[in-house]
């Protein structure tokens, strides 16, 4: 919309605007091209409702969810509209505007979160969540990857055993061969391989996102256990962005935890005091917690994105953040089963155990 509006300001005719619209649509479907975008147009808008919403869905779906009127135009886009139909086109456009305003009102909390992120980052509410989060963590460094850490989690040569060189044994091993760590205390997963775009571990294909497992049946008295902040914790434990930038990310995560626990005084001192002005009352604190949650979720998505961005490490072919959690859940499943329990279901960071004691 920004580019169409900017082109109209430059004097494009309706036909030229249509052709520009088609170029933009086709460039999105294929490789993104710059010959149909105007550099000055991006800041024509005040903000992007779709981008700041924490729930990503089409305007039509929002209309259904919010009980709003949805209007179809029913006219071919590639043909001129007769003058007697112009009113119908105007009503169609009106409906989109009214619906967008309703979505804005329904997602006001998301917009307040966007305002907070923009303020902390020193940018505008028209900047994307990804851009704001990038600035908060990396500052002005556009190529921070030279500080990033990445490793092969199946490399058994990195296993550290403090008792390995002792001239005697320490009795029966406390853990099985799949419970191993390197010198930094990071888990090693013996036998894990990533080949041909597939991850294999302990005789099964793990998948490239969160681990999913199920044993169909009817169960009762089920314990549902969650791993708190699995992906953010993996980023921190792996020191994925290097010492300096991982510390900033950890401060965002820790600040959100402190806010949720009402420890406002401690949270005020984090991120060089940038959060202090939003911790004056519980209402503002809730908005800040939501803003930090959006930023945290944005980071994981960018580490696994297939497009270039400052969080992307070209060595990270197997999505190490999600994979570390997935491999842990595989080990957890085997341990629970070894103790005589049924694992009814695993989904990313949660496990369901019937008749748990």
Which residues does each PLM region occupy?
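Conserved "right-hand" nucleotidyltransferase catalytic core of DNA-directed polymerases
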Residues: 57-58, 62-233, 315, 331, ...
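Helical catalytic core of nucleic-acid polymerases
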Residues: 55-56, 76-81, 198-331, 337-339, ...
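Alpha-helix boundary/capping residues
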Residues: 12, 24, 66, 107, ...
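A short acidic (Asp/Glu
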Residues: 2-9, 234-236, 354-357
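Generic hydrophobic, helix-prone segments enriched in Leu/Val/Ile
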Residues: 17-35, 111-120, 158, 163-164, ...
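A generic structural-conservation signal
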Residues: 16-18, 72, 244, 345
């Amino acid at each position: 919309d920004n580019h169409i509006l900017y082109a109209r300001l430059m004097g494009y005719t309706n036909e030229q605007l249509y052709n520009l619209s088609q170029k933009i649509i086709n460039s999105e479907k294929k490789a993104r091209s710059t010959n149909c975008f105007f550099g000055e147009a991006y800041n024509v808008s005040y903000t992007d409702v779709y981008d700041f919403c924490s729930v990503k869905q089409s305007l039509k779906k929002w209309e259904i969810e919010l009980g709003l009127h949805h209007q179809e135009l029913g006219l071919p886009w590639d043909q001129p509209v007769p003058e007697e139909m112009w009113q119908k086109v105007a009503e169609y456009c009106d409906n989109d505007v009214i619906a967008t305003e309703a979505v804005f009102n329904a997602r006001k909390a998301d917009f307040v979160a966007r305002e907070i992120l923009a303020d902390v980052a020193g940018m505008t509410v028209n900047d994307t969540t990804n851009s704001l989060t990038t600035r908060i963590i990396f500052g002005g460094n556009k190529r921070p990857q030279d500080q990033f850490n990445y490793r092969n989690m199946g490399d058994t040569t990195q296993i550290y055993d403090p008792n390995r060189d002792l001239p005697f044994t320490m009795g029966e091993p406390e853990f099985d061969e799949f419970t191993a760590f390197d010198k930094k205390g990071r888990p090693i997963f013996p036998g894990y391989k990533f080949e041909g775009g597939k991850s294999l571990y302990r005789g099964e294909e793990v998948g490239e996102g969160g681990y999913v497992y199920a044993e169909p049946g009817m169960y009762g008295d089920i314990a549902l256990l969650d791993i708190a902040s699995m992906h953010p914790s993996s980023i921190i434990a792996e020191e994925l962005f290097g010492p300096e930038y991982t510390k900033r990310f950890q401060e965002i995560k820790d600040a959100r935890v402190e806010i949720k626990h009402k420890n406002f005084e401690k949270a005020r001192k984090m991120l060089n005091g940038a959060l202090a002005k939003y911790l004056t009352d519980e209402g503002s604190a809730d908005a800040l917690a939501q803003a930090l949650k959006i930023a945290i979720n944005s980071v994981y998505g960018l580490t696994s994105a297939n497009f270039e961005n400052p969080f992307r490490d070209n060595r990270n072919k197997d999505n190490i953040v999600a994979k570390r959690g997935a491999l842990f859940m595989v080990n957890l499943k085997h341990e629970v089963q070894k103790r005589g329990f049924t694992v009814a279901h695993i989904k990313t960071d949660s496990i369901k155990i019937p008749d748990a004691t």
